[in-house]
C-alpha cells in the first residue's frame, strides 16, 4: 500500500502532465512539469513524446532525476509524463507509466492518476474475452477498453472507455493527433489546463505551470474531456449527467497538493493557514511556542501562531537526505528511522509548553515517537493538534491506504489515542472547521469518505482489495 511505515502517512499515488506545442522542446517541458509534481510520486517516472507517427519513451525507477538520465530525442509536438508512488509488491519497471500501446485505431500513451474501483471485474471480463495484460495496474484496463472500443475516432474511444470505468481517474493521453485530458465524474483527483505561448499544457496541479511559464486557464470539470490539437482546445462532457457528482478529495488541501497550487480556485497555502486558525479557535491552548512536524504541518502551524499570537518555532529539524523506505520496521528500527529524519532541538523546546501540529494521524506510531523525542529534549507539555478530522475509513479513490482495522481512530477514542501517543492534550480539527477553512469550495463538492465512510462510488470489498494487492 502507499503508506509510509516510518512517517505514518498516506501518499498520493501519482501526478500527470502533458504538453501540446509545436514550438518548444516537448520532452524538456514534460520533464520540468514532472519535476514540479515530484511530491505526488517519488518511486518511478516516465515520459512519452510523439510526432503523431512514432513514440519515444523513457522511464525508470526512483526520483525523476534518477529515473530519466536522458530525455527522449524524437522531434515531437506532444508529450505526456507521469510520476508514481509504487507499493511494496509493485516495485516493477513494467508498471511504470505512461503506458504506450499501438492498435488498429492508432497509438496512444496514457498517464493515470487515481484508482479504479471496478478494475478487477473489468479485467476478469477482458481476460475471459482474450485480452492479455502485461502489468498489474488498473491503468492497463483503460488502454484495453480504448483498444477494444468500436467508436470511430480515438477521442470517442477514450470517452467510451471513460464511461465504463468507475472510481478516481484523471487521465492525460496522447493520440496520433491530439492531447486529451479526462477527469472522472466525481472529480476526485485534480486536473487543470494551462497555456504556453504557442500551445497548451495539462497538469495534476497548477504549480507545474509556473516551472515552464505557462498561464493557468482553468480546472477540468468532473465528467469533462478536453481535446487539444492544432485547432486549439475543444471540450465535451463525456459522462452521463446523472453520474456527475463532484467530490474532490479534501486531502488534496490538507496534505497532498503543493502549497503553491490552486485547486478548484482555492489556494492550498491559504487553506492550510485557515486550518491552523480554525484549530486555534477550537482549542485556545495557552502555550509557549507553536511547532509543526515538518513539512506537512508547517503552514497550519503558521496559521495557528498568527491567530493565537504564540510564537512559531522550529524545534524539529528535518534531514532532507534520509530517503524513504518500504521496509516494514519493528519498533526499534522505526524509532531509529524517525531520529534519522527528525532531530529535536533542546535549546528550542526545553521547558516549553508546545502546540505541535501535524496534518493527520494514520496509525499513531510516529506521533508517539515524536512526542517521546520532544520530551526527551526537555519539552514540558505537548498539545498535539491535527489539521484534519480523525481518519476512520480507508480511501479507495487514488490513495492506497491501510485497511480500516489498522487506522487508530477506527478502533480508539480520542482520549485513548492521546494516551497512546503520550501527548498531554490531543485535538482533531472538526469537519465544520475544515469546511470553513476550505471556504472557496462548497461542502457538497468535497469528499470526506476517509472521515465519515460516505463512499459515493461503490468500493471493492476487502477480499477484492486483497486480490488486487496480491496481483501487485
Model-predicted segments: where are they?
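Phosphate/diphosphate-binding loops
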Residues: 160, 208, 215, 223-224, ...
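Short, glycine/charge-rich flexible loops or terminal/linker lids adjacent to PRPP-binding catalytic cores
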Residues: 309-354, 364-365, 392-398
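Secondary-structure transition/capping motifs at alpha-helix termini
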Residues: 131, 151-152, 282-287, 306-313, ...
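Conserved short alpha-helical segments that host acidic/polar catalytic motifs at enzyme active sites
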Residues: 1-222, 227-287, 293, 381
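Generic beta-strand/beta-sheet core signal
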Residues: 111, 174, 182-183, 194, ...
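PRPP-dependent phosphoribosyltransferase catalytic core
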Residues: 162, 177-178, 213-219, 372-472
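A conserved beta-strand->alpha-helix junction
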Residues: 135, 140-143, 312-323, 420-438
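Flexible loop/turn segments at secondary-structure boundaries
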Residues: 26, 87-88, 118, 188-189, ...
